[in-house]
């Protein structure tokens, strides 16, 4: 019991540390894509930039909006971070001491629950911008999670297990491209970052958050980004550090290369293109592997 508790605490520390370096790596990649340097002024090659940014955020004052509950204003970002943290326990490659057989079902429950934290954070902020961003996030979640679950079911049928212990197989690569699109939508990353559209919603659902609350939302967002990069590597490439790093880099380059999609086009993409394709793929895998 004590050993498990120590491992859980160490894992949280490692996740937070990885987020610090990943944000620095992202800023350098975005700078390189625009033919400029990233942060280079703080210590050697800007290595302490992410750490000092975190300290600066923690020193900010948290102003609770009028007519909003201070407890819920801090509770919702905390729940968002816990949901992101629990997602990591579905990966048996790292956490054999706590993983279980039906981890895929637990993972689907977590990503279904994560949208409620976004929705409630927009509600408790008592801001029109935050509310619009939260509504967009919830409608986007309803659209993509159905197709996302069907693609995951295709992989379950292919491997005949309910966890993420998968081996590399070329037949799964036809699922990977739509799966990558689903991941971008799940993470609210460009070009599907409608819940945080800066040009129209200032910052979206997190516009009123600062200090510790904003740090928790930031950690949950980038922790999920790292998790889904590792998850894609585990599901399609037998878990490779190089594959995880490459997938994360692809997500960053997509952000730097493509403008924000139009909202109605995104909804039609999910409902009229990706969902029918996922149903066809599910029927195909079911027929091939069970009949």
UniProtKB/Swiss-Prot annotation:
Main location as per UniProt: mitochondrion
EC number: 7.1.1.2
Record bears the keyword Transmembrane: yes
Keyword annotations of the record: Electron transport, Membrane, Mitochondrion, Mitochondrion inner membrane, NAD, Respiratory chain, Translocase, Transmembrane, Transmembrane helix, Transport, Ubiquinone
Subcellular location: Mitochondrion inner membrane
Entry-linked InterPro entries: NADH_UbQ_OxRdtase_su1/FPO (IPR001694), NADH_UbQ_OxRdtase_su1_CS (IPR018086)
Sequence intervals crossing the membrane: 2-22, 71-91, 104-124, 142-162, 164-184, 211-231, 234-254, 269-289
One example of a Gene Ontology biological process annotation: aerobic respiration
Outcome following mutation: residue 90 to I: In strain: JU403, JU439, JU516 and JU793
Membrane topology field: Multi-pass membrane protein
Any single GO CC term annotated in Swiss-Prot or TrEMBL for this entry: mitochondrial inner membrane
Record carries keyword Translocase: yes
Record family assignment: Belongs to the complex I subunit 1 family.
Name of the molecule in the record: NADH-ubiquinone oxidoreductase chain 1
Organism (species): Caenorhabditis briggsae
Record lineage: Eukaryota, Metazoa, Ecdysozoa, Nematoda, Chromadorea
